[in-house]
Amino acid sequence: MKTFALILAGGQASRMGGEDKGLALLGGKALIDHVIDRVRPQVSHIAISTNRNLEEYARRSPHIFPDARQWQHFGPLSALCTAANDLQLAAADWLLVVPCDMPYLPDDLVARFETVSKRTPLCNAYYVETPITMHYNIMYIRPQILQSAIPYLFSGMKTLRSWLQQQRARPVRFEFDGHFADLNTQIDLQEG
């Protein structure tokens, strides 16, 4: 089974003062490098969605792409709509989607998603649930459902939560919320 990863690094980083969040440093290392180190052993390919510093991100993965112009500034759904037309991603059986600002992702993230997907083979989308909250921006999805994000976004809808609900996505429970801490501000980075 081929699982690819799509790392979302295309946001405006308004809470980070406009600094490119994926390249912000945590312990002397870019946030995206922490994320790549966590997911690389779990997947066979990594793609990065980013809208700036393309050359810098290309050093980390040759498979990078910006949001298509018509979908820019619609958050993570912009990346999903653009990815819907990416033939390389379409070759995967599953796509792990994670943001660039979660440096503590668990080493068994894909294994846990795979286990649940084998028990529920008709389900095409999963997301993380912890005792504290739902993390809709961490998804394990069939690449074929990405096409449905396009009419969803054109209809004026913009949230991952309702798109995942439309896909009848199921939560996968993780007990330790600390794995999913997102570092959105400079203060978060200092405390991280």
UniProtKB/Swiss-Prot annotation:
Protein family (similarity comment): Belongs to the MobA family.
Pfam families, A to Z: NTP_transf_3
Protein name: Putative molybdenum cofactor guanylyltransferase
CC terms in the record's Gene Ontology section: cytoplasm
Names of required cofactors: Mg(2+)
Subunit structure as annotated in this protein's UniProt entry: Monomer.
HAMAP family with a match to the protein in the record: MobA (MF_00316)
GO MF, any single term: nucleotidyltransferase activity
Residues of the signal peptide: none
The entry's keywords: Cytoplasm, GTP-binding, Magnesium, Metal-binding, Molybdenum cofactor biosynthesis, Nucleotide-binding, Transferase
Domain notes: The N-terminal domain determines nucleotide recognition and specific binding, while the C-terminal domain determines the specific binding to the target protein.
GO terms under biological process: bis(molybdopterin guanine dinucleotide)molybdenum biosynthetic process
Organism of this sequence: Neisseria meningitidis serogroup B (strain ATCC BAA-335 / MC58)
Location relative to the cell: Cytoplasm
Positions annotated to bind GTP: 8-10, 21, 67, 101
InterPro entries listed in its UniProt record: MobA-like_NTP_Trfase, Molybde_CF_guanTrfase, Nucleotide-diphossugar_trans
Binding of Mg(2+), residues: 101
Function recorded in the entry: Transfers a GMP moiety from GTP to Mo-molybdopterin (Mo-MPT) cofactor (Moco or molybdenum cofactor) to form Mo-molybdopterin guanine dinucleotide (Mo-MGD) cofactor.
PANTHER family: MOLYBDENUM COFACTOR GUANYLYLTRANSFERASE (PTHR19136:SF81)
